[in-house]
Design a protein with these regions (language model features):
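S-adenosylmethionine
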Residues: 1-427
């Protein structure tokens, strides 16, 4: 099995599966005895082709008389891989990109793949669509489905949509949250090559490479958490001996961050709808030497009366469309937003339940990893009308200031995931 052969197989599998791309890739790499360099090549090609699929297909359509639908998936995937390497991977020689792609297909298809890739090589630059149809232009150039391109254009306008999607398409470092129970951020920065501190969260570190191979992973010195999520936890203003309810906790990063802010003193109840996912929280807490988290399977929309009025802080990081994290979940680029139409009601129901757990003068934190107002500001406005005992509370973390109590973080503005945070107090 070669790295390109594995990438080819995984891309075909991803086309036919609803599984998240990171799970597909991680499961496959764990079964291969590849060198770090080979693992990196598989990851780059797999994610790169997934992220740029519509743009790559536009190149194929511009060079071939056959439609995309008429090309079998094995051949189409090999073409996408070859074009991705020719366009984006400067360190891969063109002859290697072409020959290795030809080797992935049958003899019957080899001539076709070779002809398309060599024709592109002769042209020397990608085909760009016309801007006359701006929705189609955005869809192809930034590789998002046309309904999603249309939605972003309505929310942001043309110029900001391009800035937003350019930032989404820019490769990001991994973001770590230092476990200050066990080590300092300075210690991580000193021992992890090419690392640098995050701009606003006080314990964040940008790093490169495989997470499990980084200094301090086995010792529990850090966990993976985007800076936006770290900012949300810091905005809570946690103290030692607080009682916290985390309603949609898996995979556990906000519960972990809260426990660290509380210096591992107090109590955190981490709930999730899916019991099998809670093992991630349990294992993560064990690695991080955190012992104040109690997990249980529960539907966040259904009240558990014994928790009414007990929490100093309640975290509602609700299920959402995920359109702020397209860089981490590239398969969402091709999801029609209409498929998420039921989410605002689910989010609203979770908020209506969560508010019962907040004690007087306690804090309710609502967050999503989307940029859609229907799941963010609109939900909060409607909640405040239903629950006048709550009000928005201004907050500031680093240079991020939410004077109104809520803010949408954007990758092209704040260098984070697209992320919404609202902080409310029970009066």
């Amino acid at each position: 099995m070669t790295p390109r052969k594995l990438a080819h197989e995984l891309l075909i599998k991803a086309e036919k599966s609803a599984q998240y791309s990171n799970i597909t890739l991680d499961n496959a790499l764990s079964k291969q005895n590849f060198s770090p360099a080979d693992k990196k090549l598989v990851s780059i090609i797999f994610y790169g082709v997934t992220e740029r699929k519509l743009f790559l297909d536009h190149q194929i359509s511009s060079l071939s008389s056959r439609t995309i639908e008429d090309i079998d998936i094995n051949t189409l995937t090999a073409l996408r891989m070859g074009l991705y390497q020719l366009i984006y991977l400067d360190r891969v020689p063109p002859h290697a990109a072409i020959n290795e792609s030809v080797n992935l297909v049958s003899k019957k298809s080899a001539g076709f793949v070779n002809a398309i890739l060599r024709a592109f090589q002769r042209k020397g630059s990608p085909f760009l669509p016309s801007k006359d149809n701006i929705e189609q232009y955005i869809s192809i150039c930034y590789s998002v489905c046309q309904p999603l391109a249309s939605l972003f254009l309505r929310i942001f306008g043309e110029a900001e949509t391009e800035r937003f999607l350019t930032a989404i398409n820019t490769a990001n470092d991994i973001t770590l949250r230092t476990n200050t129970l066990l080590c300092s951020r300075a210690q991580l920065l000193e021992n992890i090559d090419t690392s640098k501190p995050t701009e606003n969260s006080s314990s964040g570190v940008y790093a490169k490479g495989s997470v499990r191979d980084l200094y301090g992973f086995d010792e529990g010195y850090f966990f993976v958490q985007d800076e936006a999520s770290q900012i949300a936890v810091e905005a809570l203003g946690l103290k030692e001996n607080d009682t916290v309810v985390d309603l949609c906790s898996c995979p556990g990063s906000k519960s972990f961050g809260a426990a660290i802010e509380m210096k591992n003193k107090g109590k955190i109840y981490s709930f999730d709808l899916h019991e099998n996912k809670l093992s991630l929280v349990i294992k993560g807490a064990d690695r991080l030497k955190i012992n104040i988290i109690e997990t249980a399977a529960a539907d966040a929309r259904i009240n558990i009366s014994k928790f009414d009025g007990i929490a100093d802080k309640v975290i509602c990081d609700v299920p959402c469309s995920g359109f702020g994290v397209l860089s981490k979940k590239p398969e969402l680029r091709y999801k029609d937003p209409s498929a998420s139409a039921s989410l605002p009601k689910i989010q609203s129901d979770i908020l209506d339940n969560a508010c019962h757990y907040v004690k007087k003068s306690g804090i309710l934190l609502y967050s999503t990893c989307t940029v859609l107002p229907t799941e963010n500001e609109d939900n909060i406005s409607a909640f405040l009308k239903r629950h006048p005992e709550f009000s928005l509370l201004p907050w500031k973390v680093g240079n991020i200031e939410a004077k109104s109590g809520m803010i949408t973080l954007l990758p092209h503005v704040h260098s984070t995931d697209g992320f919404f945070i609202a902080k409310l107090i029970k009066n």
